[in-house]
């Protein structure tokens, strides 16, 4: 079948799609066979009714089948958020990724330019001098030599060009906000995944379990798709097929609670300058929330036994200059292509 209309009708009637039907529908979308109106109707019908675990698994299957892959070490991790939380914070996961890389854990970071915010990972890294226009071989070399490689989503998921304009015109969250973190081109099995709403914490952990992930935390922190320092973070931790739920507070990281305003960012240039300032030694709320996310990532990757050890390793990555060196090497290797 190469017609999306039957699937639009089914979802509009509030029927759930099987994994097979969901994959077929997204294959149609990603092949370019659906019109913008059909895509918009399908995405919003899913959004209003609520996407199911099976629909997300099927959609991810379609995305992964068409993506441009990257080779990364078995122990690589991704630190990624769905975006779409509307909070306008700094690029928290970007700085956390550099801290983790500086601590010796390879990071295969998947991200994009901002869609619904002022600055995505790609915007900040580009402003810092990282070359985003590189192929899989160079990205693999970045991971090997800098400890961090950035996979620009639009280059690895070229089929997304068929939905990009519709997503921008809709201007609201869709299933694609959920799919990006689940379709890492390096096939990482360890991830810290932030989601834009608390109701997605458990379902995305189930999706990642069904997709074969090994060690994952899916988190939501009081309106943020990150572990937050503003209050309570809900966590679904997947380890070897078992999902455990718990909550975290800033005190669990030895940190003070802060206001959301302290975490507000700006455009790519603004956020890049703030990130560089932390690497240069600034101690502020942006540093602290990134340390917390890095500490959790080091636990997920098995480098730290608990959050206290994770925080110590993360702080050492900054104080020793490890995180700063990771960025410098990433800039150098990416531009040597």
Swiss-Prot record:
Q: Does the keyword Transmembrane apply?
A: no
One Pfam family here: Glycos_transf_3
Q: In which pathway does it act?
A: Amino-acid biosynthesis; L-tryptophan biosynthesis; L-tryptophan from chorismate: step 2/5
Subunit organization: Homodimer.
Q: Which family does it belong to?
A: Belongs to the anthranilate phosphoribosyltransferase family.
The answer, when asked if Glycosyltransferase is one of the entry's keywords, is: yes
Which residue stretches, if any, does this entry annotate as coiled coil?
Answer: none
Q: Which reaction does it catalyse?
A: N-(5-phospho-beta-D-ribosyl)anthranilate + diphosphate = 5-phospho-alpha-D-ribose 1-diphosphate + anthranilate
Q: Which InterPro entries match?
A: Anthranilate_Pribosyl_Tfrase, Glycosyl_Trfase_fam3, Glycosyl_Trfase_fam3_N_dom, Glycosyl_Trfase_fam3_N_dom_sf, Nuc_phospho_transferase
Which metal ions or organic cofactors does this protein require, according to UniProt?
Mg(2+)
What processes does the entry annotate via GO biological process terms?
L-tryptophan biosynthetic process
Q: Report the co-factor binding details.
A: Binds 2 magnesium ions per monomer.
Locate the residues binding Mg(2+) 2.
225-226
- Its protein name is Anthranilate phosphoribosyltransferase
What Enzyme Commission number(s) does the record list for this chain? 2.4.2.18
Q: Which GO terms describe its cellular component?
A: cytosol
* Taxon lineage: Bacteria, Pseudomonadati, Pseudomonadota, Alphaproteobacteria, Hyphomicrobiales
Question: Where along the chain is 5-phospho-alpha-D-ribose 1-diphosphate bound?
Answer: 81, 84-85, 89, 91-94, 109-117, 121
Uppermost EC category? transferase
Q: Which keywords belong to this entry?
A: Amino-acid biosynthesis, Aromatic amino acid biosynthesis, Glycosyltransferase, Magnesium, Metal-binding, Transferase, Tryptophan biosynthesis
Q: Identify the residues that bind anthranilate 2.
A: 167
For this UniProt entry, the molecular function terms from Gene Ontology, in alphabetical order, are:
anthranilate phosphoribosyltransferase activity; magnesium ion binding
